[in-house]
């Protein structure tokens, strides 16, 4: 039995490995090596937000933006979960995977006042009667992915509202003026045609 075992594993009398062990044995050895480590998914919060500390999720504002704050304080947000709508397979009506994030926009001092005002004008359909900005996500069957998408929506809103519109060049201003003049000429021409058509109809009826 020992001889057969030695031949099977390709071992010499001194214990030197002559042949590579089977693949399943290599996998077992690999599993034994990683038993002491902690596995983290690529979608874990530590990897999605590597600069996050405690309840604050760090976010770098673009250089061209005026927004001074560089983080989204999670403790200032109201986060809740509910059941998603639509088809969900085995999870339908069983798992609270839909994420909802809301916060009072007017009192969100971690966003500059001009940025808050622009967000209130641009996304007024997302603000309820209590003045809360409500964002939802149910694109994934996992809570943390939907939560990450809601936070990304907040970042996109802040970045969009923080951008300073650039001044048009002289050439762009000239082209814009020519387009407006052309539109006005076409509008007056159509107006004259309609007036002439109505006049001809009255003359025909008389």
UniProtKB/Swiss-Prot annotation:
One of its GO terms (molecular function) is peptidyl-tRNA hydrolase activity. Its EC number is 3.1.1.29. One of its GO terms (cellular component) is mitochondrial large ribosomal subunit. It catalyses: an N-acyl-L-alpha-aminoacyl-tRNA + H2O = an N-acyl-L-amino acid + a tRNA + H(+). It comes from Mus musculus (Mouse). Essential peptidyl-tRNA hydrolase component of the mitochondrial large ribosomal subunit. Acts as a codon-independent translation release factor that has lost all stop codon specificity and directs the termination of translation in mitochondrion, possibly in case of abortive elongation. May be involved in the hydrolysis of peptidyl-tRNAs that have been prematurely terminated and thus in the recycling of stalled mitochondrial ribosomes. Component of the mitochondrial ribosome large subunit (39S) which comprises a 16S rRNA and about 50 distinct proteins. Keywords: Hydrolase, Methylation, Mitochondrion, Protein biosynthesis, Ribonucleoprotein, Ribosomal protein, Transit peptide. Residues 1-29 form a transit peptide. The modification N5-methylglutamine is found at residue 90. Methylation of glutamine in the GGQ triplet by HEMK1. This is Large ribosomal subunit protein mL62. It is an enzyme of class 3 (hydrolase). InterPro entries: Mito_Release_Factor_mL62, Pep_chain_release_fac_I.
């Amino acid at each position: 039995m020992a001889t057969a075992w030695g031949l099977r594993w390709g071992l010499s009398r001194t214990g030197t490995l002559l042949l590579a062990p089977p693949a399943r044995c290599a996998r077992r050895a690999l599993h034994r090596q990683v038993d002491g480590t902690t596995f983290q998914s690529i979608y874990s919060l530590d990897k999605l937000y590597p600069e996050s500390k405690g309840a604050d999720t760090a976010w770098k504002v673009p250089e061209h933006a005026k927004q001074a704050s560089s983080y989204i304080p999670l403790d200032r947000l109201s986060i809740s979960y509910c059941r998603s709508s639509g088809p969900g397979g085995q999870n339908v009506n069983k798992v609270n995977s839909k994420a909802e994030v809301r916060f009072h926009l007017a009192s969100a001092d971690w966003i500059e006042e001009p940025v808050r005002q622009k967000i209130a004008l641009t996304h007024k359909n997302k603000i309820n009667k209590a003045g809360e900005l409500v964002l939802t996500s149910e694109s994934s069957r996992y809570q943390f992915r939907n939560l990450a998408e809601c936070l990304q929506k907040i970042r996109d809103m802040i970045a969009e509202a923080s951008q300073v519109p650039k001044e048009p060049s002289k050439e762009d201003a000239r082209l814009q003026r020519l387009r407006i003049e052309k539109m006005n000429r076409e509008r007056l021409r159509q107006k004259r045609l309609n007036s002439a058509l109505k006049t001809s109809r009255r003359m025909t009826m008389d």
